Amino acid sequence: MVAEIDNSAEEADDGDWMTHMLRSSIFHRIPASNIQAVFIKMEAHPVRAGDVVIKQGDEGDYYYYIKQGRAVVTRLTKTGQTIKLAELEAGSSFGEEALISDTKRNANVTMLTNGVLMRLAKADFAALLQGPVLETVTYDEAQKLVGSGAATWLDVRLESEHKNAALPGSINIPLFMLRLKTASLDHSKKYIVYCDTGRRSSSAVFLLTERGFDAYLLKDGLMAIKQAVHP
């Protein structure tokens, strides 16, 4: 009898996190077959308070969804200071930046409490989520959208890079600050996201889409503009 009650509670708990995850705007863009595969491929990963789930500088291996627990996102600066970027709770996801941009982890994620994470391996993430979610536009298409007032440029490079060369009228929010700064963006606007090559901006588009923003990736980044001007 006890086993039956425990199993029912576990099934209800599984249903709750899956239902919550399906509310993400990400799942509005992917086929039903992909959604089913995501839930099949995801594996449970128990964690304890103090566990470092992601370490800055490491290679990206998994995309994470917090089923239970809370975590903190921090970044170590070049001067040795630790900056707190965000606190994550059940229903939050993290780890997509390094997977999409194929770069090293740009922050630490440490558990504040015991919990359970659901994780998806890099190859499965790329095949099931990343591909269908990222919508790209060419430089010509982006120019028309921005010129008509239908969209705004969003530069996710570092502030120093933005000051050195940026598209007129663009907003600058470095990728590593984007989680913290999304509240400053307008859900009623479209955003054309760019960086130098498209790597960082790909991560930004995924993160923004996940949060319900209408975001598009400038294909090939600023390199596309250089090619358009100097073919």
Which ranges hold each PLM region?
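Cytosolic regulatory regions built on CNB/CRP/Popeye-like sensor folds
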Residues: M1-N164, M177-R179, R200-K219, M223, ...
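Short loop/helix-cap segments at secondary-structure boundaries that form the rim of catalytic
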Residues: H162-P168, L185, A228
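Helix-loop module immediately N-terminal to the HCX5R catalytic loop
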Residues: G169-I192
